[in-house]
Amino acid sequence: MKYFKGISFYIIIFILILVIITFFTATDNPPKMSYSELLTEMKAGNVKSIGLQTDTATIELKKPKENNRTKFVVIVPPDVTSASERFTAALDNKLIEDFHVTQPPQPPWWVSMLPTVGLVIILILIWFFFIQQSQGGGGGNRVMSFGKSRAKMTVDDKKKITFENVAGADEEKEELAEIVEFLKAPKKFVELGARIPKGVLLVGPPGTGKTLLAKAVSGEAGVPFFSISGSDFVEMFVGVGASRVRDLFEQAKKNAPCIVFIDEIDAVGRHRGAGLGGGHDEREQTLNQLLVEMDGFGINEGVIILAATNRPDILDPALLRPGRFDRRVVVGLPDIKGREQILKVHSRGKPLADDVRLDDLARITPGFTGADIENLLNEAALLTARANKKKIGNEEIKEAAFKVMMGPEKKSRVMSEHDKKVTAYHEAGHAIAIKLVSSSQKVDRVSIIPAGMAGGYTASRPQEDKSYHTRSQLIEEIIIALGGRAAEEITMDEVSTGASSDLKKVNQIARNMVTKYGMSEKLGNMIFGNDNDEVFIGRDLAQARNYSDELAAIIDNEVKSIIDNAYQKTVSLLRENIVRLNKLAEVLLEKEKVEGAEFEEIFENAVLEGSSQTPQLEG
């Protein structure tokens, strides 16, 4: 049946029909004769009869010519005297035996309708084609299946993913293992009167493995697994979303026990009534149907819903209540142990050199998700292949880490000497500030080679994972971020635009200290603003702030005070360590890149070598 799918098949059929009709309606047309030849034959008395039809004359000769033919067709030129009068005169003069005028033959009614019917058929085929494309393609049998679910069912996949393929999420796997156990042996739970959760919501940042966990549940359970994206419900026509939800659950009930996985459920499950303008939202109708199917009047036994999102704050409360999504599993960033386990999983099949230690690599990748770590090792493998090496070494992994964090280096970009000096002192200021004030961070590399969107970078890493930050640690973050701007002011007596991203970070930290963390001396243990971390247009747009204009001015003053005090401290620290600042900048201008070990050596030996005067920047 696959050959009967698509618009091409119907176009070929239509062309064949036209060819057949043309073949059967074709007649044996007589050959043509010129008008001058006709006049010659008339003068010779060889014309028996003439039949005139508008500007075409059909003649019959007395004596055959050209393959014994006696009938010919003559096209009468429009610029000659009236052919009818000439032929009538010839008839009167006995030059021809017969002359008659005929009307054009009328084709059969079905022939005259062919162009109209053909146009209608072509338009219908084009309409079918566009509808098919808008519904995701797949052939003519899907043209009218607007309300059918787009869910893909997986049963006994040979390349299935199990919990062994998921690392760094032990607690999350334990939560989901209960679901698998219920599907395999529900009797144990039923005898105790326990009710298995109807739905499990996987929540976490992008790249932490939510979809991978769902695939692992599918592989472990050994039951039919339906997977669909939240955006697949709502498409072109009104009412299609609700219809697809009904069809999805009908299929699931027929294959129970089974699992239904809805990825990015926030595309269809967002808060109702949050649309601007108050108009009806097709998503709301789809969500209402989803709510009914999950926990309504219908019986829905043996169907477990898994869903994933990184925006739980915008989901509708009715969707999150017990009875629908009974359990919420937070898939967070992996800790150092989890990162090491993830590295072991993704390093399978990759030849590693002897100098590679996965525990050290896990230590220098705080904040990396599972997807980041996989990308890191893949980039390292690509760098190794580019260098024609047989094994992935520590050097390639380190370069890949910087590439993932900062972006690829743009060594071909031409920078003026003035810009290089500004960048060198700016990055040196960051590095010196890290060494002076931070006990938890270590400088890995200082570079003035442009990378990503930055003109240079100072890469550092925390010594350990942190769950909380104290006020002094946040002040340290501000001082480190202001190190570049302070170094510019000390060495140039002016500042540049290179600190724009640093200032944005500084202002965000200081404002959070005042409005979210209660770290202001004047305002004390109070928080201000919306409790929601992210604004959801429609729901949050009309919400007013919960403090007065006078209090807003105090908040701004407190933010400014924190930043100003930190900046003065930064300037003071760098002035006290001007020798180290100058030395590091000189080395950066010479080498363009300083690794962590060399930076430590410069920092320790700069004072011993003596002070050098601060160079004046040109331009």
Swiss-Prot record:
Where found?
Cell membrane
The catalytic site is made up of E427
Instruction: Identify a single GO molecular function assigned to this protein.
Output: zinc ion binding
GO terms for biological process, alphabetical: protein catabolic process; proteolysis
InterPro entries membership: AAA+_ATPase, AAA_lid_3, ATPase_AAA_core, ATPase_AAA_CS, FtsH, P-loop_NTPase, Pept_M41_FtsH_extracell, Peptidase_M41
Q: Which CDD domains match?
A: RecA-like_FtsH
**Which cofactors does the annotated protein need, by name?**
Zn(2+)
Per its UniProt entry, which superkingdom is the organism in?
Answer: Bacteria
Q: Does the keyword Transmembrane helix apply?
A: yes
How are cofactors bound according to the entry's free-text note? Answer: Binds 1 zinc ion per subunit.
The cross-references to Pfam families, in alphabetical order and at most eight, read: AAA, AAA_lid_3, FtsH_ext, Peptidase_M41
Matches recorded under SUPFAM superfamilies: FtsH protease domain-like, P-loop containing nucleoside triphosphate hydrolases
Binding residues for Zn(2+): H426, H430, D502
- Keywords assigned by UniProt? ATP-binding, Cell membrane, Hydrolase, Membrane, Metal-binding, Metalloprotease, Nucleotide-binding, Protease, Transmembrane, Transmembrane helix, Zinc
The EC number of this protein is 3.4.24.-
Q: What is this protein called?
A: ATP-dependent zinc metalloprotease FtsH
Q: Which gene encodes it?
A: ftsH
